[in-house]
């Protein structure tokens, strides 16, 4: 894992590298060449109901990515509001995509495009939303997993859509907080319609379509333990395709459950 400092190029490929568009093993680990990266971010809130974010990442010789987020909320009663958001993501290969040799190239497609949106409702201790993400078939969305999680509205812990093209993702999220008890509970249910595991040009890691259920319970300590938070996370992933596939595309990928017990300290 990423437990030490890496050069930018060597940080890409620490985790699983998946396959090339022709199904052969990707070989970009320790073969990705870049002089570094630069990031520019702009946030603007013209009024209390509207907020904008724009981010641009330039990774020399690999890719350029632009991310735009627009969010709107509308108060509809005492401590209640409707919320809506739109995200647009455009990624383009630059230079060699990391390496001049195809099997060692990190970004093999010329571009990828993603659209994500949400519509929801919030009160002082309740929240619920419907979320949708579309990764077009323009190319595989490739963002180094070592650098963090996906930013899209359909993101669920222990879920990634990186390495995929032609995806339809639907997620319902609901949560309730209990301020006096310092407890919060969050539920998320998602359906992720993915290309065939044998469509290597659109499915880098051989992940089949799946349904996912997350239950997240948290307790925040106070007093001498102020800043400490405990978390119990349950995840279930179920295969959501009738396609006949090899066990290697099922084991540790779908038809599985996971429990995490975590202690976080927030400074």
Protein language model features and the residues they cover:
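Solvent-exposed loop/turn segments connecting transmembrane beta-strands
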Residues: 32-34, 57-67, 164-166, 179, ...
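Outer-membrane beta-barrel translocator domains and adjoining extracellular loop/strand segments
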Residues: 2-15, 65-69, 95-103, 141-146, ...
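Membrane-embedded beta-strand positions of outer-membrane beta-barrel proteins
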Residues: 1, 52-54, 70, 84-88, ...
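Repeated loop/turn-to-beta-strand initiation elements of outer-membrane beta-barrel proteins
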Residues: 48-52, 77-84, 125-130, 137-138, ...
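C-terminal structural cap/anchor segments
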Residues: 125-220
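Transmembrane beta-strands of outer-membrane beta-barrel pores
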Residues: 2-4, 56-60, 74, 88-94, ...
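Residues on the lipid-exposed face of transmembrane beta-strands in outer-membrane beta-barrel proteins
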Residues: 40-44, 68-72, 117-123, 130, ...
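Outer-membrane beta-barrel "beta-signal"
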Residues: 253-267
């Amino acid at each position: 894992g990423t437990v030490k400092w890496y050069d930018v190029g060597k940080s890409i490929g620490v985790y699983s590298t998946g396959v090339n568009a022709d199904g052969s093993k990707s070989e970009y680990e320790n073969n990705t060449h870049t002089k570094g990266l630069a990031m520019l971010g702009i946030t603007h809130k013209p009024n209390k109901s509207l907020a904008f974010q724009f981010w641009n990442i330039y990774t020399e010789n690999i890719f350029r990515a632009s991310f735009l987020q627009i969010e709107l909320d509308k108060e509809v009663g005492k401590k209640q509001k409707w919320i809506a958001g739109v995200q647009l993501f455009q990624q383009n290969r630059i230079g060699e995509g990391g390496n001049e040799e195809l099997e060692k190239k990190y970004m093999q497609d010329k571009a990828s495009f993603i659209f994500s949106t949400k519509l929801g409702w919030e009160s002082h201790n309740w929240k619920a939303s419907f979320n949708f993400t579309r990764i077009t078939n323009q190319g595989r969305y490739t963002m180094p997993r070592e650098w963090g999680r996906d930013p899209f509205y359909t993101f669920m812990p222990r879920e990634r859509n990186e390495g995929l093209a032609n995806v339809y993702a639907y997620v319902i999220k609901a949560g309730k907080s209990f301020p006096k008890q310092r407890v919060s509970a969050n539920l998320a249910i998602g359906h992720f319609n993915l290309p065939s595991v044998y469509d290597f040009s659109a499915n880098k890691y051989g992940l089949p379509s799946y349904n996912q259920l997350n239950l997240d319970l948290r307790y925040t300590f106070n007093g001498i333990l102020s800043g400490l938070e405990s978390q119990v996370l349950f995840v279930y992933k179920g295969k959501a395709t009738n396609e006949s596939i090899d066990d290697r595309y099922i084991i540790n990928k779908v038809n599985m459950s996971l429990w995490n017990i975590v202690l976080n300290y927030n400074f």
